[in-house]
UniProtKB/Swiss-Prot annotation:
Enzyme class: hydrolase
GO process annotations (BP): methylglyoxal catabolic process to D-lactate via S-lactoyl-glutathione
Binding site for Zn(2+) 1: 53, 55, 110, 127
Assembly behavior: Monomer.
Swiss-Prot/TrEMBL keywords: Hydrolase, Metal-binding, Zinc
Protein source organism: Salmonella paratyphi B (strain ATCC BAA-1250 / SPB7)
Protein name in UniProt: Hydroxyacylglutathione hydrolase
UniProt pathway annotation: Secondary metabolite metabolism; methylglyoxal degradation; (R)-lactate from methylglyoxal: step 2/2
Residues annotated for Zn(2+) 2 binding in this entry: 57-58, 127, 165
Enzyme nomenclature, EC number: 3.1.2.6
Amino acid sequence: MNLNSIPAFQDNYIWVLTNDEGRCVIVDPGEAAPVLKAIAEHKWMPEAIFLTHHHHDHVGGVKELLQHFPQMTVYGPAETQDKGATHLVGDGDTIRVLGEKFTLFATPGHTLGHVCYFSHPYLFCGDTLFSGGCGRLFEGTPSQMYQSLMKINSLPDDTLICCAHEYTLANIKFALSILPHDSFINEYYRKVKELRVKKQMTLPVILKNERKINLFLRTEDIDLINEINKETILQQPEARFAWLRSKKDTF
């Protein structure tokens, strides 16, 4: 399997997973034009679309792509039924695409019906987890999002996090505003800044490293707890997550 990315809009990535025969699955095509261009250039043969949630920048290109490739199966949660999904999927489902098995798990928070697709080592997590951050809570609660992130955090160390936006630099700046002396985050910031100056992408990221730079995955880390305790004493990891999310919302 080969992982490819297509830039879209200002900071979206549309992921395309291909096999050796050129058959492919397209993840969250927010617009059709760049996908159609890439398909023509690489001579890919689209077999399926994965949708993680219903937001327009993730589903906007589905119907046009289906006009060109009506044989495609479009997998998505119930909230994407009116966005072009032909096969509804949910927590615990498994599907076979490109000869590979993908496991789905519900990750409510950003939206209530958000799902992720996992076939080791690839995790397509939409707007649940970003490198250095997590999605805004447009529909769900902090508790829901925390539990969703813990599902992701339980995956193997070598999982490749394929999130949908290039938010890494801004997220690392936020992390440093909370833990300014964290050596790993500081070093990672320098690397990410250099990549972005060169207009290179920072994704995908390996989960083992993400656990070190993403404060939303470090709610039981003593350094973070000590920093939060300077402002307020929060006993539960979920409460510390909610505190972080509130801080990020106004950062």
